[in-house]
Amino acid sequence: VYCELYAGGKYDNNKGGMYEYSLGLNGLGACATQYSSEYMDVTVVRDKTQYTLHFEKGENIGGLQKSETRSVQTGTVQKWKPDTEVFTDINIPIEFFQDVLNKQAMVNAGLKFVLYNETETGMEMFEYYYENGIVDYVKETVGDDGFTTVETWEMEREGRDRADKEDYRMKMQVAFCFSNKVNMLEYYHNSSY
């Protein structure tokens, strides 16, 4: 996923498995970020094994490192610095990352995202988590101002964009309530299924 564009497992989404409903571009963002970074470090912990990769200017330095771990926690940590030879400005506002991770937490119910922001004065930590996904987000947004409960619709469908393309699967969840103080209509595409 980090070394080859479009190497992710989401493209074979019609045969079941991990990414059964995904239409996302897994492998594009991770690889493009790695290629355009001064450095990128990736650590993955799963199945009592820790995997690490180190990249510099698009090159994998040292290959895949694998070691046993006693950690019961699993997950992926990515740390990188955009390359100033690629980008004219690498000062990305923290609000951008906060917004993206909040939306990802919303569409990935029960999955916690943690953002560490290293500053000159120390380390800031932000956590994003919605146990019930968009339902909790709607409740949080409306607060006590809703005059109905949050209603949800969930559905799964198959579709095809063109006759010469294969069918794909889609999963959708809609959550809404009524409020005369909060007016919003938002759409989020989750490419993480």
Question: Can you say where each PLM-predicted feature lies in the sequence?
Answer:
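Short conserved segment of the HATPase_c
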Residues: V1-A7
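Short, functionally important structural connectors and interaction interfaces within domains
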Residues: C3, G17-E20, S179-N180
